[in-house]
Amino acid sequence: MSCSNLTMLVSSKPSLSDSSALSFRSSVSPFQLPNHNTSGPSNPSRSSSVTPVHCGLRDLRDRIESVKNTQKITEAMKLVAAAKVRRAQEAVVGARPFSETLVEVLYNINEQLQTDDIDVPLTKVRPVKKVALVVVTGDRGLCGGFNNYLIKKAEARIRDLKALGIDYTIISVGKKGNSYFIRRPYIPVDKFLEGSNLPTAKDAQAIADDVFSLFVSEEVDKVELLYTKFVSLVKSEPVIHTLLPLSPKGEICDINGNCVDAANDEFFRLTTKEGKLTVERDIIRTKTTDFSPILQFEQDPVQILDALLPLYLNSQILRALQESLASELAARMSAMSSATDNATELKKNLSRVYNRQRQAKITGEILEIVAGADALV
């Protein structure tokens, strides 16, 4: 008998964090039996109800095997993501002190140049008529709502700019963002760039060159960077911070002027407990170097600033790429963990249905034998 109406669906469900998880569910109850009385007139009160479906034992065995195979795949993807997210987190935490300290150094140099009334193009704040929005998305799916949350943040920012009467252009980084903006030709895109499984300074430099030329040529008056900030394994948040001109606060700030520097970092170790993958977490306070507001330079501050500004652009963009990758891997790990748990539960339910139907079939055969024996007596 056909088992076409008993389906296994894979859907995205939001978890407690910003990432979502895959889930498996059955569209009908597997415990319902079909109604064989179809000769009589239909009952209007039951015409809209879902017709129960009886799956054969072979169909159920195929379902169970399919779920087992899916469970193996999701478990493997979970372990791969767990191994990768550890390396990605180390890269993020290692790069944060350098990028945050560099911003503070540039701020102090810029303060001295402003007192000397020296004009530096990359630090000059001018009336905003057009904004370049760099959107950093992922390259792959199966990571819950990671990419959707980021794209919704970009859409909200675009609506805000339109409401203010400010023109904008998009620099899309990542395959998911590229495919989204390609399908929407009414959104102006300056450039499409591919992401990387292991972001490097070379990848960041390609983006930095583009935003540098746009800002210096005054095609845009402001450059904003939209990416997903890595907070912990179970939490990540899309943030927008101003890349150019240089922040007047001497720290990495979002578009509202709030600091997005990490006050502390979460370190974790992957261990096994009772045959299952577990995570041990440690919270470590982020240490930054305090600089005196009065700095002495051997070289001309303008020369130092000209040398550090390209490094500033590269480091900030590289940091965004690294944090986005770590957030994507953490979301994928969470999604695959949830999918594995749901596959295990679905396998138990299908096995229970299979055993009940097998038992009912054996009981029916025994009753037929007994009835046949009674008929011969």
Swiss-Prot record:
Residues annotated as catalytic: C143
GO terms for MF: proton-transporting ATP synthase activity, rotational mechanism
Listed Low complexity bias regions: 37-52
Disulfide bonds: C253-C259
InterPro entries associated with the record: ATP_synth_F1_ATPase_gsu, ATP_synth_F1_gsu, ATP_synth_F1_gsu_CS
Pfam families on file: ATP-synt
Keyword terms, alphabetized: ATP synthesis, CF(1), Chloroplast, Disulfide bond, Hydrogen ion transport, Ion transport, Membrane, Plastid, Thylakoid, Transit peptide, Transport
Residue ranges of the region described as Disordered: 30-52
Transit peptide region: 1-55
Organism domain of life: Eukaryota
A Gene Ontology biological process term: proton motive force-driven ATP synthesis
Keyword Plastid carried by entry: yes
Subcellular location field: Plastid, Chloroplast thylakoid membrane
Membrane-topology descriptor: Peripheral membrane protein
HAMAP family given in the database record: ATP_synth_gamma_bact
Family named by the database record: Belongs to the ATPase gamma chain family.
Role summary: Produces ATP from ADP in the presence of a proton gradient across the membrane. The gamma chain is believed to be important in regulating ATPase activity and the flow of protons through the CF(0) complex.
Quaternary context: F-type ATPases have 2 components, CF(1) - the catalytic core - and CF(0) - the membrane proton channel. CF(1) has five subunits: alpha(3), beta(3), gamma(1), delta(1), epsilon(1). CF(0) has four main subunits: a, b, b' and c.
Listed PANTHER family: ATP SYNTHASE GAMMA CHAIN, ATP SYNTHASE GAMMA CHAIN, CHLOROPLASTIC
Official protein name in the record: ATP synthase gamma chain, chloroplastic
Source lineage: Eukaryota, Viridiplantae, Streptophyta, Embryophyta, Tracheophyta
Gene designation per UniProt: ATPC
